[in-house]
Amino acid sequence: MSTVMIVGATRGIGLELTKQYSEEGNKVIACARDMNAASQLDELASGSENIRIEELDIAEALSIESAASRIGKDSIDSIIIVAGYVGGMPENQTIDNIDIDEWHRTLNINTIGPLLVARAFKENLSSSGNGNLMILSSQLAASTWPMGGMYVYSTTKAAVSKVGQILALDWAEDPIIVSIMHPGWVQTDMGGPAAEITAEESASGIRNVISGLKKEDSGNFYKWNGEIHPW
């Protein structure tokens, strides 16, 4: 069995990934930004010996470093960074009403945070001998998906996709596979009830992709169903 770390495990895709991995007997380090807002995760963990909850706020460098210190040198086979932020009024954003402070906040969560997590836990992934780092991005990050508005979310996800690609190049000699994932349009708090797939379907697809990755796949951008997503 593997050890999997889920960053952003309190709800939606992250919670479902925690559920699926733990039910198969894997050890899951489930990371929550706010321990007081993790009731669903707490309930899931109470019925499983395989789930360890850790506080990790991806927007705060000190929180990431503290989590890394608590986890220590334990080997981690896969890290899936689910945590993200849509960045206020996404459907109504225009060049005239963008909140620049909100843009900075979203960049910190969606782009800089995943880079800091990668840096903090690189040795944990390396020690597994075949580590996987998957960063959830979005189809809205792709130049092949032209869509107006949503400046804040789209640009910060485009940036983190590039972060993933660069990490794959820089870690080419390390035993770590880096991948970028479009999880689908998912029925979560962010995606809404009209979305195309459930969190269960998305999580299952993500797990299938990870299980089939090889080193030569590092740097690829995937859809939840296993297809390569064009950049």
What are these regions (language model features)?
Residues 24-39:
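Conserved glycine-rich Rossmann-like NAD(P)H-binding loop of the short-chain dehydrogenase/reductase
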